[in-house]
Amino acid sequence: MSWRAVTLTGRVAILAARYGGGFVRCSIVDYDIMRTMKYIKLRMDFEGIVSRTVVVPSDWSLAFLHGVIQAVFGWLDYHEYEFSVPGDPQKRRWTEQSASLDGFGVGKFLESSETQISALVGKKGDKIDYTYDFGDCNEVEITLLGTVAKPSPKEFATEGPDVVEDSAGVGGIAGIVAIAKQGKGKEYKQVSEWLRRAFKKHIDDVLDYPSVRDIYTRVFGLVKTASTANPKAVSPCWLDYLVVH
């Protein structure tokens, strides 16, 4: 079992605790996110560069799923978002404060907090489109891989680094990765410092919630990586690219 899968599991656990999802216990061996009967496994693909595979309760709302996506991709919820279903003849879109958006654009806006994930995907292979930050136009394709009897870190997977806020979308991330892989030079130093500042802010935001501080520390403490107390620490998913001094 990879340490990256464990840290990704921890991020979803943080969301469960942070949003009052009934988090039960946190252990690499025996692990629950919520007291629910059905879990679904979702693969989230960002333009063929970054992907995350997570397990969430099927009765979570799309608003909660938005929170999970933000956590596992490393975004900070600075911008607007929407969900849609490919090929939907009604062109429905789910977002926050949907009533204020009706009449703008094409299709009907619905409230993401009032719609369960299971209402959009029911069988293996069903897809949901997620768009975040209409400036960068970050588009994530979500695919239902199936149901899971009980979530555990082995069900979680991650490919590629976190997607930094306001990085000009997929092209920006590709450029950042290319610079980070150089390992030295002026551009590398600038990117390293920028990433450290970005993820330090994210870590500080998470640790502002006492109810999740212990969970966060214990989950991330299971792996040999930068301490969350280290002001120079970056997201674990970036440790493949950056050396933390």
Over which residues does each language-model region extend?
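Short linear regulatory motifs enriched in tryptophan with gly/pro/ser
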Residues: 24-245
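Residue-identity detector for glycine
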Residues: 10, 20-22
